[in-house]
Regions:
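Soluble non-cytosolic domains of exported or imported proteins
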Residues: 26-29, 58-62
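Second-shell loop/turn segments in exported
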Residues: 22-25, 50-57
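Short, aromatic-enriched amphipathic alpha-helices that serve as compact interaction elements
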Residues: 16-34
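Short, solvent-exposed secondary-structure junction/capping segments
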Residues: 39-53
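Bacterial Sec-dependent N-terminal signal peptides
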Residues: 1-22
């Protein structure tokens, strides 16, 4: 019985690790399409980013795609990395992934650094096809460093 629990934990962390690596890749490549694939399809995602972006609102996954397309058109990522190897456990079936995002304005080369928090939740698929639901972004918050 303990081995089943351990296997479940290892599988959960493995899937979570794949998600966090995909988030890192989306930011490094300034790729709103990849980020869009990681956003929850169940409801709206809350996004709150301080200056220089200065935005806070709930939006659909499609709106988030267009929002990040505009962000990546204005700013270029030059550093994005996780603050810790494992995400912080928020509650059952959800985690907070904390990362440092450094980016610069493409027009004037002003550099900015934010601490970004991604709330990740397990999203149940509509059918019974996937035994382990994927981790999806339900919230993105940031604060200046």
């Amino acid at each position: 019985m303990a081995s089943i629990g351990f296997f479940s934990l290892v599988l959960t962390l493995s899937l979570l690790s794949q998600t966090t690596r995909s988030i890192e890749k989306a930011f490094f490549q300034d790729d709103p399409r990849l980020l869009y694939t990681l956003i929850s399809r169940q409801g709206h995602v809350y996004i709150s980013l301080p200056d220089p972006i200065s935005f806070s609102d709930q939006m659909s996954p499609e709106q988030a795609y267009f929002f990040f397309r505009q962000v990546y058109a204005t700013y270029s990522t030059f550093e994005f990395y996780a603050d810790s190897e494992l995400p912080v456990l928020a509650k059952e079936n959800s985690f907070i992934f904390k990362a440092r995002w450094s980016f610069k304005n493409k027009k004037n080369d002003n550099q900015h650094v934010l601490q970004v928090f991604f709330h990740l939740a397990r999203e149940k698929p509509p059918g019974r096809g996937i035994p382990q639901p994927p981790w999806r972004i339900t919230e993105i918050k940031a604060e200046p460093l």
